[in-house]
Amino acid sequence: NCTFRPPIYNRREGDAIKSVQIDHVLVGPEGVFLIETKNWSVDSLNNLDLRSPVAQIRRTSYALFKMLSGGVVNSDIALRSHHWGDRKIPVRNIIVFINQKPREEFQYVKVLTLKELRNYVAYFKPVFSKEETQMIGNYLLGLNA
């Protein structure tokens, strides 16, 4: 759980984010992967009373983006410079379904089964050095301390 005082405000969604619960964050040379896991049945997938995992991960992703941006601005995360400008930390949103997954695809969110996860992450080319990867990971671990 991450709590924010003052809340992080997402203007686009009109949402004051006071806290988020993050299932998993994978930090690797390929970027940062925000992973929400769901062990849902077919009935759960069709249940309109359950909160949308897509909305949930997009909300959490915005908070994670703001945390990482703060680390770069405050020089807690020092990425190798590039003569074109500031480099970004890609955050990729993944919902992993253990049992059933929906057939639909969603904007800014990849929906996978557990078996598909490894190949999806391996698909991306490295954008960070070993040192940068370690720095990002240490920064995120320090936020939770």
Predicted regions and their residues:
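Surface-exposed interaction regions that form or flank ligand-binding interfaces
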Residues: 1-20, 41-47, 51, 55-145
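Phosphate-centric recognition/catalysis
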Residues: 23
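Active-site beta-strand-loop-beta-strand hairpin of nuclease catalytic cores
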Residues: 17, 26-42
